[in-house]
UniProtKB/Swiss-Prot annotation:
Signal peptide: none annotated. It catalyses: a plastoquinone + NADH + (n+1) H(+)(in) = a plastoquinol + NAD(+) + n H(+)(out); a plastoquinone + NADPH + (n+1) H(+)(in) = a plastoquinol + NADP(+) + n H(+)(out). GO terms for cellular component: plasma membrane-derived thylakoid membrane. GO terms for molecular function: oxidoreductase activity, acting on NAD(P)H, quinone or similar compound as acceptor; quinone binding. The keyword Thylakoid applies. It is an enzyme of class 7 (translocase). The lineage of its organism: Bacteria, Bacillati, Cyanobacteriota, Cyanophyceae, Synechococcales. It comes from Synechococcus sp. (strain CC9902). The keyword Translocase applies. The gene is ndhM. This is NAD(P)H-quinone oxidoreductase subunit M. Pfam families: NdhM (PF10664).
Length: 115
């Protein structure tokens, strides 16, 4: 499997069975790479990034020992999408007003006027 690159792509999460080497993805059966919010739809604090990385580690650890498949990657990616939505709903994460597109893919911003 070392030559096969598996990937999962959701709106805000991209997962690869690879490591980054000189800005290139090198397939790896033993490593997962997380690309978070590639379209910069959100404004990320260090705390939010850390929380997503922690959740990613928990999900990877929980899947350890099992088959590394497209399905496993999709489950991890989908769970991370849900976690990002929770951060947004709690007000810990916010939409980036400078983003290329304002589509509010995870719901309208939670502001006092809208609550």
């Amino acid at each position: 499997m070392a030559d096969t690159l598996l990937k999962c792509t959701t709106r805000h999460v991209r997962l690869f069975t690879a490591r980054v080497d000189n800005d290139d993805l090198v397939p790896s059966a033993n490593e997962l790479t997380l690309d978070l919010d590639p379209d910069n739809e959100f404004i990320w604090s260090e705390s939010c990034i850390s929380q997503v990385q922690q959740r990613f580690k928990q999900l990877v650890d929980a899947a350890a020992g099992g088959e590394l498949s497209d399905y496993t990657l999709r489950r991890i990616g989908t769970d991370l999408e849900g976690f990002i939505r929770q951060l947004l709903q709690r007000g810990e994460l916010s939409y980036n007003p400078e983003a290329r597109v304002q589509n509010f893919s995870m719901g309208l911003p939670r502001t006092p006027e809208l609550l």
